[in-house]
């Protein structure tokens, strides 16, 4: 994702769903001085660590962290890139919820679409809830292939599998 952002200079405003400890937001903001990132995290402990990490990196003027459920986060801002890295089973709902914050050319970036290889090989897991989750991820991948609002490229061999969906 970082290389994608680096090579697309038009990406300036980013929304990240799933801050965790702020690593991705910090890395994105460090790529170029002209980017701003809004990042949303529901877990208070993760959020607090992220805020500390963002401040330690000196990026608090360009990385804005919000502690709330992503479905409660409302903004009229239009983003160049929307990075969804939260609850994998909710990817489609997040995409629909934040589609109003997109325009033609906005990039939706989805991570972890292989889920450690289990999506394509469910026999790798004996855990029922993991198998159910990977079925939902597979269903989302299949849906994304047919969603005519996007031009989508899958790179399942990159990291843990990614999709880059550009709004038509």
What are these regions (language model features)?
Residues 1-168:
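S-adenosylmethionine/decaboxylated-SAM
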